Amino acid sequence: MSEMVNVHGWMEEALSSQDEMKERNQSAYDIISGLCHEERGSIDGEEDDEEEEDGEKPKKRGPKKKKMTKARVERFRVRRVKANARERSRMHGLNDALENLRRVMPCYSKTQKLSKIETLRLARNYIWALSDILEQGQNAEGKGFLEILCKGLSQPTSNLVAGCLQLGPQAMFLDKHEEKSHICDSSLTGHTYNYQSPGLPSPPYGNIDVHHLHLKPSSFKPVMDPSVVTHTLNCTTPPYEGALTPPLSIGGNFSLKQDSSPDMDKSYAFRSPYPALGLGGSHGHASHFHTSVPRYELPIDMAYEPYPHHAIFTE
């Protein structure tokens, strides 16, 4: 009987201890929850203050940037090194393939290396030319084959192709020059030449016929020894093949029949202000050259004093 009383007392003590523990846990939970509410309230208050201060600035959106740790930096470096190695190997393979393509082209040169785009263009033209040879039965050494090969290529590449085929660098342009020469010959047989002058009206000056031009003899009289004059006349200059000047009267040598004026037909003598030296004499006074034709004087506003006719001695 006494044992049962002891067991009952022990059970009551255990229950009372459990109740005390529950009360303690509840009080601790209440304290923690109160602290959490206070912290949340303070954080909300701080955020409200920041929003009021920075109300004009937009909020940053998107994923947050992770911190760069040593492990991440190392991973990035390894990834970049691998990407560079892949790109390097790809470019090496491309260059090797282009070099093999250059070797099978009809103009392979170790000194003059074709660019990538020129190599691809030449390969396209080569395939095109070979297909034409197979279809039409043409000769691979003709000019047509060379023209197909050089279509769309630059001038140095075209010269290289022509040199390798032993046709000369300008062989592909011979037919074109011949056609141009025939066109020029046919145009030279015409009678009318059109010259455009920018500063003059077109009716009498823009167009001119060949039969309207005639060469007048020079109106200047020689003032030196006739032998020197004949020597200078025999020395002729090569003809000028460029474009002719507009058909105006220049120096009284050229004139137009339709625009001829009486003043231009007059011949004016040339008189030198200096005394002429005798070409055959050794020493002595120089003889003056006088002409009976009156000289032509231009009106000049400023005063002009001629040089005195004094004797000139040769030393």
Swiss-Prot record:
The keyword Phosphoprotein applies. One of its GO terms (cellular component) is nucleus. Keywords: Activator, Developmental protein, Differentiation, DNA-binding, Neurogenesis, Nucleus, Phosphoprotein, Transcription, Transcription regulation. Residues 78-130 form the bHLH domain. Residues 58-70 have a biased composition (Basic residues). Serine or threonine phosphorylation within the basic region may regulate neurogenic activity. Residues 44-55 have a biased composition (Acidic residues). The modification Phosphoserine is found at residue 89. Residues 39-71 are annotated as: Disordered. First expressed weakly at stage 12 in primary neuronal precursors. At stages 18 and 21, strongly expressed in the cranial ganglions, with weaker expression remaining in the spinal cord. Later, strongly expressed at sites of neuronal differentiation, namely the eye, forebrain and cranial ganglions. It is found in: Nucleus. Transmembrane segments: none annotated. Pfam families: HLH, Neuro_bHLH. SUPFAM superfamilies: HLH, helix-loop-helix DNA-binding domain. Efficient DNA binding requires dimerization with another bHLH protein. Forms a heterodimer with the bHLH protein hes2, and weakly interacts with hey1/hrt1. This is Neurogenic differentiation factor 4. The gene is neurod4.
